[in-house]
Amino acid sequence: MSQLLTARQAEELHKAMIAYLLSANLPKSAAALREELADSVQLDDSTAKKYEGLLEKKWTSVVRLQKKIMDLESRNNALQSELDSATPTSLARRNQDPVSWLPHAPARHILQSHREPVTCVGFHPVFSSLASGSDDTTIKIWDWELGELERTIKGHTKAVLDVDYGGPRGGTLLASCSSDLTIKLWDPSDGYKNIRTLPGHDHSVSAVRFIPSGAAGSPLSGNLLVSASRDKTLRIWDVTTGYCVKTLRGHVDWVRDVVASPDGRFLFSAGNDQVARLWDVSSGETKSTFLGHEHAVECVAFAPPTSYPHLAALAGLKKAPPSSSSAEYVATGSRDKSIRIWDARGTLIKTLIGHDNWVRALAFHPGGKYLLSVSDDKTLRCWDLTQECKCVRTVKDAHGHFISCIRWAPNIIKDAGVVNGDDTSTAASANGGALGASAINGVVPTGKKEDPGGGPMMGIRCVIATGSVDLKVRVFAS
């Protein structure tokens, strides 16, 4: 008898082995084992039924435990490597200062439910809800804190290409766009009911973004939405009426991406024509064009005011633009594998080289010091704007396939009652009169009474999400 097992354990194992052989239709082998064990195991047919499947369960349990051990060892090695390369001073500073936080492996959560590639992700401005869209035509709503799927939204008939939360104050909506040529608006406060469908584009709608309130003093402030399409146009919509209020023309090929400036005054777009354009929302005119990429431009981003001092220094300026100004610096990512940083006039400041495949999405760190990028090379890269845009961290194999998107959770403004244009008092009343823990999880105060622009103190949520052709969404969080 094995010294590793007690007599009782050995008997249970033998019964499970015989039951397995019988269930596998191997009666001769089962009989041979019974004969070999002689009288040490009493197992009639009725008792054998109780042991069916037991061996398989134990086997799969062992496999799961082995996988858990390997995952924990991998996580431990990654953390140990990070610890070994850090000094006590840098560790203390990182623990205290969210401005220096960067994502690292392993991800906090791996969210799996989509049946085809994940194309887009978007964070709710207040609560711990994360939306993801996919080629499988669905939108899925996750709780990124718990790593759980909350619901699946169906309505589009082709691939969902982008999602974004925003809208009027106190009335956050989710917008989605699709290859089915439509944009749809969903109400999170009413079970994500589809409240409006916006037709009008003549081809796939590639990107959709809410325009923050205060767009050039427009009476429609807070109600505007912009979309980009393969039909070569941008369209601005009034979400309360569903009407297209403006069509912007200038691109001569598929418009891949569009974003709005933080104050809603400007739009930045780019596409297959290898050109990026800065637009004035109120006039609908192109303010600047950005030329230099050698392939389609996949993604664009506005630099936050917190990055102005670093980018001004990079541009050789002695004084940074005021943080109250809008759209001073922008970034573009391209299929030519490069990232380019520009000023608002279209002057190239810096070209970032390092990715080995198409650059698919960009996100500036809200603290202003870093730019994050993801690529078809399966990596997530962090570029330090204070070190000549040096790549200071690479999360290798962040996904198992091409990475299609990245979003940083929006900041929470601590004392203004407004969260990125959303009235938190409404959200609080819907949650029993006060913001629950999930509404503020992941928030780390900056430690400053005011932001650089003189506004209210903001809390940086050290949370990002990425999506991939590997069908998964990954959440990286502090």
Swiss-Prot record:
Subcellular locations according to the entry: Cytoplasm, Cytoskeleton; Cytoplasm, Cytoskeleton, Spindle pole
Claim: Transport is one of the keywords in the record: yes
GO biological process terms held by the UniProt record: cell division; establishment of mitotic spindle orientation; microtubule sliding
Major localisation: cytoplasm
LisH domain segment(s): 9-41
Cellular component, GO annotation: cytoplasm; microtubule; microtubule associated complex; spindle pole; transferase complex
Keywords: Cell cycle, Cell division, Coiled coil, Cytoplasm, Cytoskeleton, Microtubule, Mitosis, Repeat, Transport, WD repeat
Keyword set includes Transferase: no
Residue windows of the WD repeats: 113-154, 156-196, 200-247, 250-289, 292-352, 354-393, 398-439, 440-477
Coiled coil: 60-87
Gene Ontology molecular-function annotations: dynein complex binding
Domains: entry comment: Dimerization mediated by the LisH domain may be required to activate dynein.
Physiological role: Positively regulates the activity of the minus-end directed microtubule motor protein dynein. May enhance dynein-mediated microtubule sliding by targeting dynein to the microtubule plus end. Required for nuclear migration during vegetative growth as well as development. Required for retrograde early endosome (EE) transport from the hyphal tip. Required for localization of dynein to the mitotic spindle poles. Recruits additional proteins to the dynein complex at SPBs.
Binding partners and assembly: Self-associates. Interacts with NDL1 and dynein.
Family, similarity comment: Belongs to the WD repeat LIS1/nudF family.
Record-given protein name: Nuclear distribution protein PAC1
Species of origin: Paracoccidioides brasiliensis (strain Pb03)
